[in-house]
Amino acid sequence: GFKYTHGTPFRRAIEENLIDPKKYVILGLRGALYDPEDLSWAREQGVTIITIDDYYEMGFNKCIEKIYEVLVNTDTYFTFDIDGIDPTFAPGTGTPEVGGFNVREAQTIIRALNKINFVGGDVVEVSPPFDVNNMTSLVGATIAFEMLCTMTKVN
């Protein structure tokens, strides 16, 4: 495979010492992986990975607590990958995976993170050519709005 892809920027950032893997959380991972070794490697580096199955097993409150444990007192950049949302609600992405969060769940999670010191953020993987009736664009804008409100502590 290729070393640099849309699915590997954070691995490369860890390899290049640009981010601290012990202060990195992945929430909602599910479905097929390009390389299962990437998941093992991330865990070995200290990345906190909460799969979608882990989330539902742990429950909302324990999941949020875990995120706070990792990110407490840390300047944090927030990337929201739109394919974390189920394609029923956000079909316009290059890698749709069934079984993701619904929009309300995503909003609730983002709002619960309002005590984290977010210093920036983005919404990635929105692909208008794959979208249906601008659904994904609307969801992406909604998620970006929620993130901005959380970053400015407006809930």
Describe the function of each predicted region.
Residues 1-155:
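Conserved alpha-helical scaffold segments that buttress catalytic/binding sites
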